[in-house]
UniProtKB/Swiss-Prot annotation:
Organism listed in the record: Dinoroseobacter shibae (strain DSM 16493 / NCIMB 14021 / DFL 12)
Entry's transmembrane regions: 5-22
Glycoprotein as UniProt keyword: no
Task performed by this protein: F(1)F(0) ATP synthase produces ATP from ADP in the presence of a proton or sodium gradient. F-type ATPases consist of two structural domains, F(1) containing the extramembraneous catalytic core and F(0) containing the membrane proton channel, linked together by a central stalk and a peripheral stalk. During catalysis, ATP synthesis in the catalytic domain of F(1) is coupled via a rotary mechanism of the central stalk subunits to proton translocation.
PANTHER family, per the entry: ATP SYNTHASE SUBUNIT B', CHLOROPLASTIC
Gene: atpF1
Molecular function in Gene Ontology: proton-transporting ATP synthase activity, rotational mechanism; proton-transporting ATPase activity, rotational mechanism
Subunit structure: F-type ATPases have 2 components, F(1) - the catalytic core - and F(0) - the membrane proton channel. F(1) has five subunits: alpha(3), beta(3), gamma(1), delta(1), epsilon(1). F(0) has three main subunits: a(1), b(2) and c(10-14). The alpha and beta chains form an alternating ring which encloses part of the gamma chain. F(1) is attached to F(0) by a central stalk formed by the gamma and epsilon chains, while a peripheral stalk is formed by the delta and b chains.
Coiled coil (residue ranges): none
Protein name, entry field: ATP synthase subunit b 1
Length: 255
């Protein structure tokens, strides 16, 4: 059997031509489409990677912001807690100070009330004692007590010379007022002692049964008293001064 090489060669040429034609007109567009698709896929994958990177960057940024916000929130909460504690401490301190102030005011008020009460009791006691003493001296006083008071007053006239002369002025007469009539020798002693201080001034004796036992000497526009009441008034003034309150005003006391 003989081979027709011309036919074989023609078949080979036809096959190669077919391959070329297939590659040229069929496979090339397909390959180009595949390449384009792969390029598109690669581009989209690149875009996806970029998007993923952006997303990861955003996520990292958001996480950082969240962490910062959490830190800021914690700092704000801590600052708010410290501020609340400081305000609470300030309010408690203010309340304690106010309470201590009110307690001090109440204590001072109680002490003041107690002092006022004691002073009132002392005043009432002193007034009662003075009233009883005044009544007792009035009831127990006799001519002998009044005579001794007058003699004591007469002995003090010399020490009161300047005051007596100023009180007398141009007056030429003095009045000695007692509760009971004085004995002649007592009148003479008082007249003599007054004359030694005030020359030319006469002395007249008068009696007032309602007067406190002792001597009231009227001279010009002045009156000097050495009576039981005047002594008690002086004692009352001393007690009132010691108690820090004004004394009741009475006649001039020369005791």
């Amino acid at each position: 059997m003989s081979i027709d090489w011309i036919t074989v060669a023609a078949q080979i040429v036809n096959f190669l031509l077919l391959i070329w034609l297939l590659k040229r007109f069929l496979y090339r567009p397909i390959l180009d489409g595949i390449d384009a698709r792969e390029a598109e896929i690669a581009a989209r994958m690149g875009e996806a990677a970029a998007v993923r990177q952006q997303a990861e960057a955003r996520e990292t940024e958001y996480e950082a912001r969240i962490a910062q916000l959490s830190s800021s929130r914690a700092e704000l909460l801590e600052e708010a807690r410290r501020a609340a504690e400081a305000e609470r401490d300030a309010l408690l301190s203010k309340a304690r100070a106010r309470l201590e102030e009110e307690q001090a005011e109440r204590a001072a008020h109680r002490a003041e009330e107690a002092a006022r009460h004691r002073a009132d009791l002392q005043r009432r006691g002193a007034e009662a004692l003075l009233a009883l003493t005044r009544k007792a001296l009035r009831d127990l006083a006799d001519e002998g007590l009044e005579r001794r008071i007058v003699l004591q007053a007469a002995g003090r006239l010399a020490d009161m010379g300047d005051d007596l002369r100023e009180a007398a002025g141009d007056a030429r007469q003095a009045v000695a007022l007692t509760r009971d009539p004085l004995p002649e020798e007592v009148q003479a002693r008082l007249r003599s002692d007054l004359g030694d201080v005030l020359e030319g001034v006469s002395l007249r004796f008068e009696v007032d049964p309602g007067q406190s036992p002792g001597l009231n000497l009227r001279l010009g526009g002045a009156q000097l008293g050495w009576t039981v009441d005047s002594y008690l008034n002086g004692l009352e003034a001393t007690l009132a001064e010691a108690a820090g309150r004004p004394a009741r005003r009475g006649g001039h006391d020369a005791a």
